[in-house]
C-alpha cells in the first residue's frame, strides 16, 4: 500500500489489514542524560488499583515461585508491563528484605534509577531515601540501616563489589534493561555468575523488554547434565500493552534523510487523520535543523489557509528541562504536535498521543578503534530491535503507523541487535575495575560477549602509561588502586591525583567536575547569535578546559543563581550537578591527602596538570590545515563548538574525546606546549631526530594470556 507521501514513496509489505504489531523495547543510548517522564494511563486510579492493572500483577505468585526455586530467572516483559516497579515490591512483600537483607535493582542509566526509585517509593508511601532509595554516581540517596529496595546503576553495583565482593547484604539482584549490554552491565553479568558459585542463596533476575533470553539462560544455567529438572535458570515472558502498528518502507533509498523527514511530516499532516508525529534523528544538530525547516514549512502551510496548525518541538538529552516538558503539554484540537527527537525518545521518555513515527534508520553510538586508539561517536544504521522499538512508539495508546526512511531490503540487512558496548569501547576503565576486584587474568574473565583482544592490549598499554599498572600488569600501589577508586575515566583520575603536585587541585577539581556534565552552554534556536555572543565572554585563548573553569567560577561567584544562568544561556541544573560532583571528588582528594592548593590565576600549572592525565590524547597541527594524532598520525579537526574553532590554530593540543560526523572532531580541546609531553610523559614520548618531532615510545607491557600460556610483548617505537 503506497503511503501518502509526495517525493518520498513508501510501501507496506503484506496485506491491507493491520500492520506489524510492535512491542517496544529499550535500547542503549548515546545521548541519555535527559529527564525521564513516563505517561501513566491509570493516573486517575488509586495506587493499589494502578498496581493491579499492570500485566505483571497476574503473574505475581508465579514469579515468586520461580525466584524461590531457581537461582536465576530471566524475565522478558514488554514496556509498560510493570516489571521494573512491581517485582522489587513483590520480593519485599514476600520476605526477601527481612532481617536486614536488600533487594538491589540495577539500571543502565542514572536517570532511570532515580525515576523508578521515586515511583516505587511513592507506591509504598515511603520517603525516598529511606525504605526505598537509589545510588548513582555522585549521588547516594539511601540509608544504610533502613533501605530495603535499592535502585542503582550497574556501574555502582560493580563499585560496591570492590568493598563487598560477595554482595553479602543482598538477597536478590535484579538486572533491569539487561539487553542494553552496557560496559558495566556486562561486567556485572560476569561477576554475578562468579558470585553465584560462592553464594547459592543469592537470586538473580535478568529483566528486559526484549532480549535474547536463550543466550542469557545458557550463560547462567549451571546445569551440566542433560536433565532439564536440574536447570538453575528459567525464562518467563510477561505480556504488555501495545496496539498494532502499520509499517511503511521506502520504495527506493533516499540520499538525504533529513530532507525526507521534513517531506514525510508535511505529507502526513496534509493527508492523515488526528495524532501527533514523532521523528527520530541521530543528534542535536540534526534535530535543530529539522525543527527549523519544519517551522518554516508550518508557516507556509498557515499562509495557504490550512486550518490545522503544526507545533514543532525538539527533544534531546541536552535540552533544558523546561524545554523538554513542552512535548508533554496538551494542545488544542486544531494543533498537531511534531516531536523531533534523538534516540532519547526510544526509552527515557514516553509521550502520549503519538500515532505516527518517522524513523531515519540511523543512530549515534560510541565506538572505539583499537588501531588508532580513538574512541568517538559515530552515526551507524540502527539494529532491527531498535527500529522495532521506535515503531512501537506509535502503538502506545491506539493503532499507529511507522514510516521508515529506508527500504524493506535494507531493514532485512540490519543487525538483529546493537553490538554490546564491551565490543566497541575503550576498555581501560573495565580492566581497571576488574583488576581492583582481584581479577588478575582479565583475558580469561567470563565475558558474555568477549571484547576484541587488540582493545584489551590497547587498554593495558594506556593503564601502564598512566602508572596504574606495572610491567606485569598488576595494579600499582598506591596509584593504581587510587585511580580505580575514582568513578571517572582513568585519565581524569590521574589528573586529579597529580593536581596537588602541580599546585592547582582547586582548579582541577572544578575542571574535572565540569567535564562530567554535557551541554553546559544553552543555544536556543531563536537566540543563537545572542547566546554565542554571551558565551564568548567566558572564552580564553588556552582553550575549552579553562573556559569551563571560568564558567564554573562565575557560577559560584554569583551564588549559583538560576536567573544569572538564564541570562547567560547556561544550563543551571548542569552547573548545580557540577558543584555536587566537585564535592564528591573533593572528598576523594581529601581521603588520598592531595594538598588543597590553587594556582592563583596562573594557567600553566593547570594546563600541565591536564597534560599529566591526557598526554595520550595529543595532536599537532599539520600543514594540511588539520591536526594529526601523535600516536598514529590520524587526522582530526577542532569541533565547531570549541572556543579554539575559527581561531589561529595552536601548534599542539590535547583533547578529551573525538566524535565522528563528516570528519573526526576533537571536543574539549586545549592548547599545550610540546615540551610538556616530553617532560610529563617521558615513558610515552621520546624526542625525535628532527626538530619538533616526537616518538611514541610504548613500554614493554606483558599480558598473561593463559594460566600456563605465553606472554605477548609490546615493544614498539613509532617516529612521527
Swiss-Prot record:
InterPro entries: DEAD-box_helicase_OB_fold, DNA/RNA_helicase_DEAH_CS, HA2_WH, Helicase-assoc_dom, Helicase_ATP-bd, Helicase_C-like, P-loop_NTPase. Residues 261-438 form the Helicase C-terminal domain. SMART domains: DEXDc, HA2, HELICc. A motif (DEAH box) lies at residues 176-179. The keyword ATP-binding applies. GO terms for cellular component: catalytic step 2 spliceosome. It catalyses: ATP + H2O = ADP + phosphate + H(+). GO terms for biological process: in utero embryonic development; mRNA processing; RNA splicing. The keyword ATP-binding applies. Its EC number is 3.6.4.13. It holds the Pfam family Helicase_C. Keywords: ATP-binding, Helicase, Hydrolase, mRNA processing, mRNA splicing, Nucleotide-binding, Spliceosome. Residues 64-229 form the Helicase ATP-binding domain. GO terms for molecular function: ATP binding; ATP hydrolysis activity; RNA binding; RNA helicase activity. ATP binds at residues 77-84. Belongs to the DEAD box helicase family. DEAH subfamily. Identified in the spliceosome C complex. May be involved in pre-mRNA splicing. This is Probable ATP-dependent RNA helicase DHX35. It comes from Pongo abelii (Sumatran orangutan). The lineage of its organism: Eukaryota, Metazoa, Chordata, Craniata, Vertebrata. The gene is DHX35.
Amino acid at each position: 500500500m503506497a503511503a501518502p507521501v509526495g517525493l518520498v514513496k513508501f510501501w507496506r509489505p503484506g496485506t491491507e489489514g493491520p500492520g506489524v504489531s510492535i512491542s517496544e523495547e529499550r535500547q542503549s543510548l548515546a545521548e541519555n542524560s535527559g529527564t525521564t517522564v513516563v505517561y501513566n494511563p491509570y493516573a486517575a486510579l488509586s495506587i493499589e488499583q494502578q498496581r493491579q492493572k499492570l500485566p505483571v500483577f497476574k503473574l505475581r505468585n508465579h514469579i515468586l515461585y520461580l525466584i524461590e526455586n531457581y537461582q536465576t530467572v530471566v524475565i522478558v516483559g514488554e514496556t509498560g508491563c510493570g516489571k521494573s516497579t512491581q517485582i522489587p515490591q513483590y520480593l519485599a512483600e514476600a520476605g526477601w528484605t527481612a532481617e536486614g537483607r536488600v533487594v538491589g535493582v540495577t539500571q543502565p542509566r542514572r536517570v532511570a534509577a532515580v525515576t523508578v526509585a521515586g515511583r516505587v517509593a511513592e507506591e509504598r508511601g515511603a520517603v525516598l531515601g529511606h525504605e526505598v532509595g537509589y545510588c548513582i554516581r555522585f549521588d547516594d540517596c539511601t540509608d544504610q540501616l533502613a533501605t530495603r529496595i535499592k535502585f542503582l546503576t550497574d556501574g555502582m553495583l560493580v563499585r560496591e563489589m570492590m568493598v563487598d565482593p560477595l554482595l553479602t547484604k543482598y538477597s536478590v539482584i535484579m538486572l533491569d534493561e539487561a539487553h542494553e549490554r552496557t560496559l558495566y552491565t556486562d561486567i556485572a553479568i560476569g561477576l554475578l555468575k562468579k558470585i553465584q558459585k560462592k553464594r547459592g542463596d543469592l537470586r538473580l533476575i535478568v529483566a528486559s523488554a526484549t532480549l535474547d533470553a536463550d543466550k542469557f539462560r545458557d550463560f547462567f544455567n549451571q546445569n551440566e547434565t542433560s536433565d532439564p529438572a536440574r536447570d538453575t535458570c528459567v525464562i518467563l515472558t510477561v505480556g504488555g500493552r501495545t496496539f498494532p502498528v502499520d509499517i511503511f518502507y521506502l520504495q527506493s533509498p533516499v540520499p538525504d534523510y533529513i530532507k525526507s523527514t521534513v517531506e514525510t511530516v508535511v505529507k502526513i499532516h496534509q493527508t492523515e487523520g488526528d495524532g501527533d508525529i514523532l521523528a527520530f534523528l541521530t543528534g542535536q544538530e540534526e534535530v535543530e535543523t529539522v525543527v527549523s525547516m519544519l517551522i518554516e514549512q508550518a508557516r507556509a502551510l498557515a499562509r495557504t489557509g490550512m486550518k490545522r496548525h503544526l507545533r514543532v518541538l525538539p527533544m534531546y538529552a541536552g535540552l533544558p528541562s523546561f524545554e523538554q516538558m513542552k512535548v508533554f503539554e496538551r494542545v488544542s484540537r486544531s494543533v498537531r504536535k511534531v516531536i523531533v527527537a534523538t534516540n532519547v525518545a526510544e526509552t527515557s521518555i514516553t509521550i502520549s498521543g503519538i500515532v505516527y513515527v518517522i524513523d531515519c534508520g540511523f543512530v549515534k553510538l560510541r565506538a572505539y578503534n583499537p588501531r588508532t586508539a580513538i574512541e568517538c561517536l559515530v552515526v551507524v544504521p540502527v539494529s532491527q530491535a531498535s527500529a522495532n522499538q521506535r515503531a512501537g512508539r506509535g502503538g502506545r495508546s491506539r493503532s499507529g503507523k511507522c514510516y521508515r526512511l529506508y527500504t524493506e531490503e535494507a531493514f532485512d540487512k540490519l543487525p538483529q541487535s546493537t553490538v554490546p558496548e564491551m565490543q566497541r569501547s575503550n576498555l581501560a576503565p573495565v580492566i581497571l575495575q576488574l583488576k581492583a576486584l582481584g581479577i588478575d587474568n582479565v583475558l580469561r574473565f567470563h565475558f558474555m560477549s568477549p571484547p576484541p583482544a587488540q582493545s584489551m592490549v590497547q587498554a593495558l598499554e594506556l593503564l601502564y602509561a598512566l602508572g596504574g599498572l606495572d610491567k606485569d600488569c598488576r595494579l600499582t600501589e598506591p596509584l593504581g588502586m587510587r585511580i580505580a577508586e575514582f568513578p571517572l575515566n582513568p585519565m581524569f583520575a590521574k589528573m586529579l591525583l597529580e593536581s596537588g603536585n602541580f599546585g592547582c587541585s582547586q582548579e582541577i577539581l572544578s575542571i574535572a567536575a565540569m567535564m562530567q556534565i554535557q551541554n553546559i552552554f544553552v543555544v536556543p534556536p531563536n537566540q543563537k547569535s545572542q547566546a554565542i555572543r554571551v558565551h564568548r565572554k567566558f572564552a580564553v585563548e588556552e582553550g575549552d578546559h579553562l573556559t569551563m573553569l571560568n564558567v564554573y567560577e562565575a557560577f559560584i561567584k554569583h551564588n549559583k543563581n538560576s536567573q544569572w544562568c538564564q541570562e547567560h544561556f547556561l544550563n543551571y541544573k548542569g552547573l548545580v550537578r557540577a558543584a555536587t560532583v566537585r564535592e564528591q571528588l573533593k572528598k576523594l582528594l581529601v581521603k588520598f591527602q592531595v594538598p588543597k592548593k590553587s594556582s592563583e590565576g596562573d594557567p600553566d600549572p593547570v594546563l600541565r596538570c591536564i597534560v599529566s592525565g591526557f598526554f595520550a590524547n595529543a595532536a599537532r597541527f599539520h600543514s594540511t590545515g588539520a591536526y594529526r594524532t601523535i600516536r598514529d598520525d590520524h587526522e582530526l579537526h577542532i569541533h565547531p563548538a570549541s572556543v579554539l574553532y575559527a581561531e589561529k590554530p595552536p601548534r599542539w593540543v590535547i583533547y578529551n574525546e573525538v566524535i565522528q560526523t563528516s570528519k573526526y572532531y576533537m571536543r574539549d580541546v586545549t592548547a599545550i606546549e610540546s615540551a610538556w609531553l616530553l617532560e610529563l610523559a617521558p615513558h610515552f614520548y621520546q624526542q625525535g631526530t628532527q626538530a619538533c618531532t616526537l616518538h611514541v615510545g610504548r613500554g614493554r607491557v606483558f599480558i598473561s594470556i593463559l594460566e600456563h600460556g605465553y606472554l605477548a610483548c609490546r615493544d614498539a617505537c613509532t617516529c612521527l
